[in-house]
A protein has these predicted regions:
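Conserved acidic segment of CheY-like receiver
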Residues: 1-33, 67
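Beta-sheet entry/capping signal
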Residues: 3, 95-96
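Short, flexible coil/linker elements and helix-boundary hinge sites characteristic
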Residues: 21-25, 56-63, 93, 180, ...
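Conserved phosphotransfer microenvironments
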Residues: 39-91, 101-109
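Short, solvent-exposed polar/charged micro-motifs at secondary-structure junctions
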Residues: 39-42, 136-142, 176
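Alpha4 helix (beta4-alpha4-beta5 surface) of REC/receiver domains from two-component response regulators
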Residues: 76-91, 97-163
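C-terminal output/effector regions of signal-responsive regulators
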Residues: 145-363
């Protein structure tokens, strides 16, 4: 069973989300269920610290695995501010998913997600708007379950190897150990520039509020893995990025089961892999070697009509634009923006998109 505390001030939204969770392994716990609506802070201590104490007790009492936090809590006027909950939950080291309802779709659908992740990736996993208030709401419960399992897998790995939290182990070393292969830690060095943000140590007066050191570090490691490493393709690639790496149109994987079956040997099975298929770039390289450098021209798939992204240079690597989500060739890709981690070698933005965005492209 996965228990999710939803901090939302609109009762109809809570009821709707609970309806989606009916007959699943997930159950939503509302602010009313834990007495959060009646919580009244005193003037003797900061609101955030009082909330941290209150939430720590309730999370333990109800066995809460994950918190789902709305960014706008101003309508019901029965809860504290979003920023207060955000700060309190970060002091606890509790995994959080945040969301913002409403809004319209855009051709640059990935841009808001990128902006939020870069700005607040060290404090929450963002749920896309379409999943909380659009045409993909049926994806909410499975996504929350997968996210909760991801954090839990990291936490259990740290519990099983307590030495990882002692001594001079870097986040790259710990992540490699959690993923079951200490030899791959170098793959994540290019993502270490933001480690001071993702792995900031709590101040002395705040440390007493954390649920546990293992929980705090598991949450930090989870944010870094999902929001930074898996968001910006490099050693771990999303399914579209994996197809592009092989210069194959992503839609071809659904058309040809033989093709998707061949890629399974390269599939990533670590934390958060249940959210969507991901693949190891190193395993894709081995796969290319097995298929003489090009899957499409290999004898096993010669009878299939497989569409390429770059039709002019079949041997080239292609990409998925970080902003539009569409396939692009190497010639269409702009120079890598400075907000992309140096380790994200497969992360590119369409040059035309970058020009159209103008100042927004600075994120």
């Amino acid at each position: 069973m996965c228990k999710v505390l939803i901090i939302e001030d609109q009762l109809d939204i809570i009821d709707r989300f609970k309806g989606f969770a009916a007959d699943t392994e997930l159950s939503f716990i509302s602010p009313t269920d834990i007495g959060l609506v009646g919580f009244s802070p005193t003037e003797d201590e900061a609101v955030e610290e009082q909330l941290a104490t209150f939430l720590k007790n309730k999370i333990g009492e109800h066995g809460i695995d994950l918190v789902l936090l709305d960014t706008d809590l101003s309508r019901g006027r029965t809860l504290q501010t979003h920023s207060s909950y955000k700060a309190a939950l970060r002091e606890l080291g509790m995994p959080v998913c945040r969301y913002q309802k409403g809004g319209t779709t855009s051709e640059f659908e990935q841009l808001p997600q990128l902006q939020r992740t870069i700005r607040d990736g060290a404090s929450a996993i963002w749920i896309p708007r379409a999943i909380v208030s659009g045409d993909r709401m049926h994806e909410l419960v499975p996504r929350l379950i997968a996210i909760s399992r991801g954090f839990k897998a990291i936490y259990e790995a740290l519990q099983a190897s307590p030495e990882l939290l002692k001594g001079r182990h870097s986040p790259t070393d710990v992540l490699a150990a959690v993923l079951g292969n200490s030899a791959i830690s170098y793959e994540f060095l290019g993502y270490a520039a933001q480690n001071l943000v993702y792995f900031a140590n709590p101040e002395a007066h705040v440390a007493e509020y954390q649920i546990s050191e293992e929980q705090r570090f598991a949450t930090q490691l989870g944010y870094w893995l999902f929001n930074y490493i898996m968001m910006f393709p490099g050693p771990i690639l999303s399914e579209p990025s994996a197809a592009a790496y092989l210069n194959i149109q992503p839609s071809e994987l659904k058309k040809h089961s033989e093709l998707s079956e061949a890629l399974k040997v390269a599939q990533y099975h670590g934390p958060f892999s249940e959210i969507a298929p991901y693949f190891w770039r190193s395993a894709l390289i081995e796969l290319l070697n097995d298929f003489d450098g090009d899957i499409v021209r290999n004898e096993a798939f010669r009878d299939l009509e497989i569409a390429r992204i770059d039709t002019q240079s079949p041997d080239s690597v292609a990409y998925i634009c970080l902003v539009s989500g569409k396939p692009i060739t190497e010639q269409q890709a702009a120079p890598t923006p400075d907000w992309v981690p140096s380790g994200a070698s497969e992360a590119r933005v369409d040059d035309d998109v970058l020009s159209e965005l103008g100042p927004l492209a600075g994120i």
